[in-house]
């Protein structure tokens, strides 16, 4: 009887150790298919214009939000908005621009066995815009200036899961397209043929899987 009890005890320890080992080797699994994101952003300076001139902005900080849904355990579809304040120092322009991204896209993750890290790559399409208010000190009037256009881009980053429902998220996003839609006080202006404008954003925030 004593030998039988020892054999059962040894078998239970072996099974528990094997189950714990298998569990530790499993990749992290979010607690929900839905995900809500909030993040801070840092956008590098960019240039908007054509062969005859351009408007150059400086690097700036901002914030954004996203909402997404896991179509599969690895594929996320999402939509979001991101706004960054960028300085400018051009003749006739002295102040700040608001750089806005409104985008929809998808991200593919690459689970790592036994790790809380979850790397991903993605792609997006959307609309970007630069907006500001131009003050004419000679006349004392102000005008709203906006430059916008469609864009496409790629992104990459990594999540670190603090728990199945909360992950720290950091990444980079690159967008390319023309901002040829120019408006002053809502009236469209002729910009000619604009060059491609590249925007680069670094982001750091958190994902919540409710």
Residue ranges of each PLM-predicted region?
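Gram-negative (and chloroplast) outer-membrane scaffold detector with strong preference
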Residues: 23-24, 37-44, 66-152, 160-166, ...
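Cleavable N-terminal export/targeting peptides
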Residues: 1-32
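Internal, hydrophobic beta-strand segments that form the core of beta-sheet-rich folds
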Residues: 172-173
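Short catalytic helix/loop segments, enriched in acidic residues and glycine
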Residues: 57-64
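Transmembrane beta-barrel domains of Gram-negative outer membranes and organellar outer membranes
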Residues: 26, 32-47, 51-53
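Short, solvent-exposed loop/turn segments at secondary-structure boundaries
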Residues: 50-55, 90-94
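Solvent-exposed loop segments that connect transmembrane elements
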Residues: 135-142, 180-192
């Amino acid at each position: 009887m004593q030998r039988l009890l020892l054999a059962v005890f040894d078998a239970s320890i072996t099974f528990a150790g094997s189950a714990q080992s298998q569990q530790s080797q499993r990749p992290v699994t979010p607690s929900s298919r839905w995900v809500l994101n909030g993040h801070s952003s840092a956008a590098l300076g960019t240039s908007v214009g054509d062969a005859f001139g351009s408007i150059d902005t400086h690097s700036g900080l901002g914030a954004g939000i996203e909402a997404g849904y896991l179509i599969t355990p690895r594929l996320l579809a999402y939509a979001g908005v991101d706004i960054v304040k960028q300085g400018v120092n051009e003749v006739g322009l002295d102040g700040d621009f608001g750089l806005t991204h409104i985008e929809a896209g998808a991200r593919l993750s690459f689970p790592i066995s036994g790790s809380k890290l979850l790397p991903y790559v993605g792609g997006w399409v959307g609309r970007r815009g630069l907006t500001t208010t131009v003050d004419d000190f000679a006349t004392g009037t102000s005008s709203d200036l906006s430059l916008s256009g469609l864009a496409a881009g790629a992104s990459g980053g990594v999540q670190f899961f603090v728990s199945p429902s909360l992950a720290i998220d950091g990444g980079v996003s690159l967008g390319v397209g023309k901002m040829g839609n120019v408006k002053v006080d809502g009236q469209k202006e002729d910009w000619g043929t604009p060059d491609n404008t590249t925007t680069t954003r670094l982001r750091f925030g958190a994902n919540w899987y409710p």
